[in-house]
């Protein structure tokens, strides 16, 4: 086991604070409408330019082990805020730095760290309650656009596109961000249910100019097994041929003789057929087949419930207005399913989302809800260069997370104003003893830090602006972008309540742990031992000289 280096008390805290300040100073220059960029060197490829706090934090690793521990703990604050609300990482870092600096001063003055922490926790709990009281619902498209614009670092086009996407697919809908091909940002909306499986044979293509299969008013056969024997399919094929409609087969797989016969029938024009694999795997595939069945008023032919493919009739088939299949995706448009049943299925999946503990499962279930309920929107980010594309895509994703958070928990005045208002409301809060009162005061004082940093980044005098904002009331604040005072919500400077709340809670949590740190332990650097092999060779040379 390697030898350890141990530091106690003030020595440990001074080192830790140095690390906290290095990381926070690098991150906080990005805060606000006039925040600056940070350039990150990569071991390969071009440097990355970013204004995203968490991206800067993730890159920082310090040489001094003790300083690095401080930096890593603040990095944890930024990551946690990012995971919870998708934004607010820089605000969280600034708050953590302010609380740690104020707290360690109090510890150095002889205060009891545990009571300070209790005071900080009391202040944060009271302020979070006030933030929830100040919060107003984010309902209109205009408000969604404003939240998106602020989170994308005042890029109004991003705000507009996110608001349009939410209008098209609903606030619960799935919105994804992809690399675009042009210079402009674009919004594409996939109507109907789309899943990522394409045609099983290119011979099914009936629109060669677009390399797609298009079926109008098709029957849809859903099978929960592999189909390789054409005999099983004959009764359904005969029924469909008599009805004179096309057929889409969605099965675990269609192979061998069955696929060959379907291709021949299609090419001869006897019956128009296309086959695709069912989406997903295992239990998720069964669930998605059931989703498609409800959407198209069909039945999944599954041996688990005693149904045989040979005995399937036209009544078991689903129907839709149109189906479009390319080599990668299948889209079912306007299934004839009963609206009440579809809503029932959506409610059932939402219940599963509530109960699920895995983020991955939640995301997949959310996608299923969107496919059943409204469709999927894709924001294609346009840029002139690869470097700009990466930076812009990160901003769009941030803005999307922020707007979702705003829809979830509402909005408060932005620009650091909400924290100042909430802090002033609980200014009379008392702890159990004087040291807790000091903890409460220092936490409330630290809540001015985001506003001060936004103003400092805009090149103004932070103390003057902070004093003016504190003397105002309601949503009165300072717009650093236009250098004007006024009503923040009317000026469109909004923050999602969830983002502000998460930033404060995570910052206080980690800062409290750092204030109560009394000892730090790290590995001693290993000393390189002299290379004995090389020394031996030298001796050999000497012997050669003697001979």
UniProtKB/Swiss-Prot annotation:
It is found in: Cytoplasm. Its main location: cytoplasm. ATP binds at residues 30-33, 51, 87-91, 415, 495. One of its GO terms (molecular function) is ATP binding. Pfam families: Cpn60_TCP1 (PF00118). GO terms for cellular component: cytoplasm. PROSITE patterns: CHAPERONINS_CPN60 (PS00296). CDD domains: GroEL. Gene3D superfamilies: GroEL, GroEL-like equatorial domain, TCP-1-like chaperonin intermediate domain. Keywords: ATP-binding, Chaperone, Cytoplasm, Isomerase, Nucleotide-binding. Its EC number is 5.6.1.7. Signal peptide: none annotated. NCBIfam families: GroEL, PRK00013.1, PRK12849.1, PRK12850.1, PRK12851.1. Together with its co-chaperonin GroES, plays an essential role in assisting protein folding. The GroEL-GroES system forms a nano-cage that allows encapsulation of the non-native substrate proteins and provides a physical environment optimized to promote and accelerate protein folding. This is Chaperonin GroEL.
